[in-house]
């Protein structure tokens, strides 16, 4: 029986999430990896196995997120670590930004993170432990031209992380704001 912590990682088709999943699988951790494109996960990491569950998930869709979290718990029995890594950048001046694109970025970078976190928290609270890693950015602290709204999403992630850490510490749940860049 595998006693290693079960990881749920969002945004795994490339970048940080992809590298993290590779390292976790190399070390034998059970991992549920999500992407909007499940096939890309299968091509990179292989088919579903005892320690790997590739899943298509749209983090902006709350009902989709809940069904994926249920699938992960059904397969592995619990979730010990959540890495909220999914997100993207939309660059434009404040004056010229397309509001539809701006809302879509907030839906993924902020509200998607909340959807996944809110779906996983009851599981972690019930088991009296867990660790949530929210990937923000140094952009939460250092803004520049063209990146105002992206940085605003990452500042929101920072604020959510700090607040959540205080709200769930009594349940044995830790929250870390990861700031790559």
Task: Report residues per predicted region.
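Residue(s) in the substrate-gating loop at a strand-loop-helix junction
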Residues: 137
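A glycine-rich helix->loop->beta "capping" turn
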Residues: 71-84, 90
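Conserved glycine-rich Rossmann-like NAD(P)H-binding loop of the short-chain dehydrogenase/reductase
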Residues: 27-42
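Active-site helix of classical SDR
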Residues: 117, 153
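Substrate-binding pocket helix/loop in short-chain dehydrogenase/reductase
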Residues: 93-94, 101-103
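The beta1-alpha1 cofactor-binding region of Rossmann-like NAD(H)/NADP(H)-dependent oxidoreductases
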Residues: 57-67, 99
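Conserved glycine-rich cofactor-binding loop
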Residues: 13-14
């Amino acid at each position: 029986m595998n006693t290693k912590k079960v990881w749920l990682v969002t945004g795994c088709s490339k970048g940080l999430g992809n590298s993290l999943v590779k390292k976790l699988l190399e070390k034998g951790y059970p991992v549920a990896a999500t992407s909007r494109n499940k096939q890309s996960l299968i091509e990179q990491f292989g088919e579903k196995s005892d320690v790997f569950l590739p899943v298509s998930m749209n983090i902006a869709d709350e009902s989709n997120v809940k069904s994926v979290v249920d699938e992960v718990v059904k397969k592995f029995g619990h979730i010990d670590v959540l890495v909220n890594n999914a997100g993207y950048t939309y660059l434009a001046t404040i004056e010229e930004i397309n509001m539809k694109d701006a809302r879509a970025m907030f839906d993924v970078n902020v509200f998607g993170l909340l959807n996944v976190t809110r779906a996983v928290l009851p599981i972690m609270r019930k088991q009296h432990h867990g660790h949530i890693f929210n990937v923000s950015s140094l952009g939460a602290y250092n803004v520049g031209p063209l990146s105002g709204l992206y940085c605003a999403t990452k500042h929101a992630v920072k604020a959510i992380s700090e607040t959540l850490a205080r709200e769930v510490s009594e349940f044995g749940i830790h929250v870390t704001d990861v700031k790559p860049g």
